[in-house]
Amino acid sequence: MVLSRGETKKNSVRLTAKQEKKPQSTFQTLKQSLKLSNNKKLKQDSTQHSNDTNKSVKAKKNGTSSKKTGTQRKRISTQRFSLFTYGNVQVMNSFVPIHNDIPNSSCIRRNSQVSANNVTESSGVFFNDTQSQDSQNTIKLKPTSLMAKGPIEIYQICTGFDKLKENIAPFQKSSKASSHDGHVVNYLSIGRHGDIVHPVLPKLQITRLNGAGFKYFISFYNPERYWEIEFLPLISQSQSELENSVKAFENVISKICQFSHINEGATIGNNESLSDKFKLPPTSDIEPPNTEIINNDDDDDDDDDNYDDDDLNYLLDEEYEQGCTDNSFSVISNTCSNLNASFLYPSDPTDAVSISINEAFKNAIRRTAPVLNIPIAAPSIHSKQQNKRYSSYPFIDSPPYLQDRHRRFQRRSISGLGDL
């Protein structure tokens, strides 16, 4: 039994070998050939794709490396030149109030301010009323805050130059911009760590105030803003060294921006406006009101004093209140007419305050004066009312002896006393 089993195994192996040796059909051979060709094509495509990816990666690497080298070259071509340095400077931010009011109201306010400021002075100062956007019509220059204190530096940045010659001064290149393809920009740096950096353009205006130390005013496109730069002496520095450094500063800024001088006499007080530099000549459209004082004779002065006494007696004496009749109307009308005729703008600074106060008091009397239409033979009711105080009388509006325009103008003039 054992042998039979071994023989059967051998026979089965021989049969399988014979079956494999049998020739295959044409369909099977075609199928196998197609499989082999497809496998070869897939291998070739995969190899080509891998080669393409390797080439693209190499090209990208080469492009990034070239870009890096290009940026490095640009950085090398940009150079910084220091034109001026100084160690001790104080910078104040100044504000200039500009009024854009109606010309008449602005005249009144400014005249009141001038009269108040010049009470203790013998000469008065009058401002021009011309206002425009281009001109800087200022009243006072007020330093508001300290911006920086420390060193100052003016430097220049040159970009786009292939080769920079060392023997040419940097600020001379800016004057010949057409001879090269580069770009030149000047900057003003203030502070230890460059706290304030501002570009110095050719249209920037820098003005020196002569006679008040070493002060310079930088004006911007906003006419209400100024920078006041003051050069302070360093430790153990002589006056001549300070003057030399200031001259070097002026020499540099005169070549890169607009630089000018102005005298101290053109200003009003300390740290105040640059008056004549930013003024325009007066135009025919806007004219200030004529300020005159009529010198009356002694008789006119006595008459005015009598009118003032009458007004005061009319307010204070009770006996005069009891005996007031239609004659009071003539007194009030005469005072009103005289005041209306002599209502003028004072220009003398010594008498400006007193005259304005008297006029305001007279105007107040005119407004509060009652119009009493009481007959001579008054009944008992009126006699009781006459014994009362002045504040208890029933007031009646006075007739319109002045036009509305004059009333408005008088109210403005009285309100202007608040500035005094």
UniProtKB/Swiss-Prot annotation:
It is found in: Peroxisome membrane. Keywords: Membrane, Peroxisome, Phosphoprotein. Residues 45-56 have a biased composition (Polar residues). Residues 1-75, 273-309 are annotated as: Disordered. It is a peripheral membrane protein. Transmembrane segments: none annotated. GO terms for biological process: peroxisome inheritance. The modification Phosphoserine is found at residue 273. The keyword Transcription regulation does not apply. It comes from the Eukaryota. It holds the Pfam family Inp1. One of its GO terms (cellular component) is extrinsic component of intraperoxisomal membrane. Residues 295-309 have a biased composition (Acidic residues). Residues 30-39 have a biased composition (Low complexity). Residues 1-10 have a biased composition (Basic and acidic residues). Required for peroxisome inheritance. Belongs to the INP1 family. This is Inheritance of peroxisomes protein 1. It comes from Saccharomyces cerevisiae (strain YJM789). The gene is INP1.
